[in-house]
Each structure stands twice: as structure tokens, then as C-alpha cells.
């Protein structure tokens, strides 16, 4: 609503609109802080040797965060794994994603794709039952006109596209 029309509204309605807007902003700030705190808690798992329950927690958190980010941007959101994340962590999380989506179906196929060529020095993601290089996936999505955003996981941070300030180191 333009400011020109806003100034002509009754005082009570203007106050209600301002109050509702501020309430939405406070909710958004609270949620961003909660996401930041959760990222901080989960980033510590990237440096240690996490237990199976911690891996499950990390996987569930990243999936929930990807769903939320996807809804906020009204597009597909994937988890981009940087090269510096230990292989055992990223592949366990991707395996957990696969199990949630497909059960034990095609688990052998997923295991074979863990062995990416050593000359491939690219970030990877899990998409539709496969582990793929992000650069190849970006080219494919661009050619198809599909917009995608990423949650980037590296050895010492989890970055979201929600707010550039939510970079946890």
C-alpha cells in the first residue's frame, strides 16, 4: 500500500497496520536468531567424529532448514557440501536423506556414486537419489530455467541465503 493512501486511513487502522508489520518483523528476527543458534550448535558436529544420533540430528536439521529456505524463496533449496567437509560426515547425511526419501531402494547405486573422480574438485549435493557436482547441476537447472538456492556447509560454517548475516563460523 502506498504512503499516499496510508496517510488517509483512519488512525486506528494505521496503528493496526504498523503494529502487525512490527510484529511480523519481530517474528522474523526471532526466527533468524533461532536459525543462527541452531547452525552454531550443529556446526560443531562438522569438526568432530559425531555419533549416529548426532548425525541423524544434523541431517534432520539441514533437511528442515532446506525446506524452510525453499518456502521463503519459493524455489528449490539444496544442501551444498564444500570440499573441506569430511567425507564421512557429508556422505552419512546424504545417505540419511536418501533413506528418508526412498528407503533402502537403490542404496547400492548411491554407494557407487560416493566415489567421485579425484580430479573433480567441486562441491557436491544430493538431488533426486543421486550425489552430483553442484556446477553440473547449476548448468542443468539454468538450461531448464529452474531457480535453485543453496545452504552451503563447509568445515567451519553453515551459510544460508536467508540473510547474509547468518554465516556461522
From Swiss-Prot:
Keywords: Host-virus interaction. Changing residue 17 to A: Loss of binding to host SKP1. No effect on viral replication stimulation. A motif (LXCXE motif, interaction with host RBR) lies at residues 110-114. Changing residue 10 to L: Loss of binding to host SKP1. No effect on viral replication stimulation. Residues 9-22 are annotated as: Binding to host SKP1 protein. The keyword Nucleotide-binding does not apply. Disulfide bonds: none annotated. Belongs to the nanovirus Clink protein family. Interacts with host SKP1. Interacts (via LXCXE domain) with host retinoblastoma-related protein 1 (RBR1). Interacts (via LXCXE domain) with retinoblastoma-related proteins (RBR). Interacts with and disrupts the function of host retinoblastoma-related proteins RBR, which are key regulators of the cell cycle. Induces transcriptional activation of E2F-regulated S-phase and G2/M-phase-specific genes. Inactivation of the ability of RBR to arrest the cell cycle leads to the stimulation of viral DNA replication. This is Cell cycle link protein.
Amino acid at each position: 500500500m502506498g504512503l499516499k493512501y496510508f496517510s488517509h486511513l483512519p488512525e486506528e487502522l494505521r496503528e493496526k497496520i504498523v503494529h502487525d508489520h512490527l510484529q511480523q518483523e519481530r517474528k522474523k528476527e526471532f526466527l533468524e536468531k533461532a536459525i543462527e543458534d541452531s547452525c552454531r550448535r550443529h556446526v560443531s558436529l562438522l569438526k568432530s567424529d559425531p555419533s549416529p544420533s548426532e548425525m541423524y540430528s544434523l541431517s534432520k536439521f539441514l533437511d528442515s532448514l532446506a525446506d524452510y529456505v525453499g518456502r521463503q524463496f519459493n524455489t528449490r533449496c539444496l544442501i551444498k557440501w564444500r570440499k573441506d567437509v569430511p567425507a564421512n560426515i557429508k556422505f552419512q547425511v546424504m545417505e540419511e536423506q536418501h533413506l528418508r526419501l526412498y528407503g533402502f531402494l537403490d542404496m547400492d547405486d548411491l554407494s557407487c556414486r560416493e566415489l567421485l573422480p579425484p580430479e573433480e574438485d567441486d562441491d557436491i549435493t544430493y538431488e533426486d537419489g543421486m550425489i552430483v557436482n553442484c556446477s553440473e547441476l547449476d548448468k542443468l537447472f539454468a538450461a531448464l530455467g529452474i531457480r535453485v538456492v543453496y545452504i552451503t556447509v563447509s568445515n567451519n560454517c553453515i551459510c544460508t541465503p536467508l540473510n547474509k548475516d547468518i554465516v556461522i563460523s
